[in-house]
Amino acid sequence: MDPLSVLKEFTIRGDIDKIERVGANYRFGSEYSFPCATETAYRSKSGSLYTLEALVHYVKNQQLKHGEYMQSTVKNSVPAVTLPDRKPLLDYLTGRVASSDSIDFLLLQQQNAQSQKQNEEYRPDQDNSAFVSRENAIADMEVEDFGKSGEDVDYIMLIRSNERPLKSRDAILQCKNRDFYSVLVNSTKREEERQRIESHQRKDGLVAKSRLMGAEERGIVGFSSGGGDDNGYDANPKSKLHFKAGKIGEGVPIILVPSAFQTLITIYNVKEFLEDGVYIPNDVKAKEMKGLKPDCITVQKKFSRDRERVVTAYEVRDKPSALKPDDWDRVVAVFVLGKDWQFKDWPFKDHVEIFNKIIGFFLRFEDDSIESAKTVKQWNVKIISISKNKRHQDRAAALEVWEKLEEFVRSRSHS
């Protein structure tokens, strides 16, 4: 009979006190004897087999609390039964359950076969009739564990009892040996191409719309309030719309920014500030753009208190010397550096004329000294203050720029 079944039998009968340790063996009354280090057929949650020594010590000390039990195992140099295994093990040994998934049935059968010869040698004084009765008892326990007498053993159950999961569902889904980086790269390229096409389409539409709006404000489109046909067109318009053949952006309002790096706003970071309402330092944006400085960029107002307002596109440039005479008529705003040399070679006689025809903005940090804006205060320039750290306030500053700019453009078109 195997050690686990013998221990279960003695536990159910209440004969635990008859289990004695003699040297390196455990004696179960006068019937059985097993080495203390014998591995039983009961497997722990971690997968290892419990020794007979560990199970006997646990059964005899099952009433102890967890801390006291652990101290007892250390004191007696006995392997401990883990906390998750204790209740299922005790339920099996006390007969509350007939079997357990933790039992290695193949090992159980092997130990049963081996222990028969050992126990016969241990009890030489026992007659054959006693041995036969013990064999009958073993048969009864096997019937109890594996089914009714005469039924076949479920070998599938025995095989499954030895199965151990090698990989979990999560481990399979992780796909450690698979690399999907190429899929990500291709997807990113397609998305960037789609955004680029949409951006060009949107820009072309905004440019065309801005041209028509500018032409209407100048009164060169052939609309008339009377004297025309039913559709409102004048039969003899005073002027007609003529576009010169030129580069893209003709007719689009222009905003000038300083080319010097010591100012807060340049062609590097003006797009994020005006379109997204977020200020990014020049050096950070220049590093992101790898030092590539564009000659011209297009910005548009993406946010407004008036949601029904028409979106207008603007060109932003930082080289006034490259502007042609016709281009200066499209300049509507300038971000000033606060230095007179910024306006050198401009087609205006003084600052008064400049800021009568062009609205000026001076962007500064709110905690900068007053001396930094001393010269600017002598000009007709709008001072816009932003915080060095509170980026959530940038949107309000950008919105103030847009409102002042739109108000100036409307007043200029009506003058």
UniProtKB/Swiss-Prot annotation:
Alphabetical GO biological process terms: flower development; positive regulation of flower development; transcription elongation by RNA polymerase II; vegetative to reproductive phase transition of meristem
Domain of life of the organism encoding this protein: Eukaryota
A Gene Ontology cellular-component term: Cdc73/Paf1 complex
Gene knockout outcome: Early flowering.
Keyword presence, Membrane: no
Keyword Transmembrane helix carried by entry: no
Tissue expression summary: Expressed in root tips, shoot apex, young leaves and flowers, especially in stamen filaments and carpels.
Subcellular localization: Nucleus
UniProt main location, coarse: nucleus
Record function comment: Component of the PAF1 complex (PAF1C) which is involved in histone modifications such as methylation on histone H3 'Lys-4' (H3K4me3). Involved in regulation of flowering time. Required for the expression of the flowering repressors FLC and MADS-box genes of the MAF family. Required for histone H3 trimethylation on 'Lys-4' (H3K4me3) at the FLC locus. Prevents trimethylation on 'Lys-27' (H3K27me3) at the same locus.
Subunit-structure text: Component of the nuclear PAF1 complex (PAF1C), which consists of VIP2/ELF7/PAF1, VIP3/SKI8/WDR61, VIP4/LEO1, VIP5/RTF1, VIP6/ELF8/CTR9 and CDC73.
Family: Belongs to the CDC73 family.
Protein name from the UniProt record: Protein CDC73 homolog
